[in-house]
Amino acid sequence: MSRFNLCALLFAGALGLVRPGAVWATAPQAIPEIVINVDDQELKVLKEGQEVAKFPISTSKFGIGDDFRSYKTPTGVFQVCAKTGENLPVGAVLKGGRFTGEVLPPNAPGRDPIVTRMIRLKGLEAQNRHTLARGIFIHGTPEERRIGKPVSWGCIRMRSRDVVELYKQVPVGTRVVICGTGRHGFGSWVAKLWS
């Protein structure tokens, strides 16, 4: 078991996502899985249990949670339920799931719209049941200089080139696990304890 998977398992237990005595299957998976570590601001793609890609991200500046109007990043188990932006140019501004015709360069000043691609998430647990209604996405941002810090309004932000790559790798139906305590850097600290 990789350190990252162990970290995810520890956080899941700490957050009450794992019942005492639960058995975790370690069999390889046929489709990819996304694991997002809020503490390390990192997204990993796993295929057949092996890490195939890793990207820096940005989650909510308000911490973790799922309440309406909280602007927090929800945690737990999710599923990719829709994808938007196929074949759009990098920096394409998306509003209401539609291309506006505007294209922004990285780090364009003044605004922070959703750009390039949108990967919509649906919560699969009671603790994240509002995710779909809240409009929580994995998406591109023009504020690329801020990636790696928790600065979003609840969504998972990525650099445009990274979200294009992720979009190609994950189909609708992909399982997504978002874990962490909401304390930036805590995941690395726990991983070091186990090394």
Can you say where each PLM-predicted feature lies in the sequence?
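Positively charged n-region of N-terminal signal peptides that target proteins for export
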Residues: 1-4
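Bacterial N-terminal signal peptides
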Residues: 7-18
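A ubiquitous, low-specificity "background" feature that marks scattered single residues
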Residues: 11, 47-50, 112
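Intrinsically disordered, low-complexity
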Residues: 21-70, 75-77, 88, 179-195
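Exported/periplasmic cell-wall-interacting domains
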Residues: 26-29, 67-69, 88-195
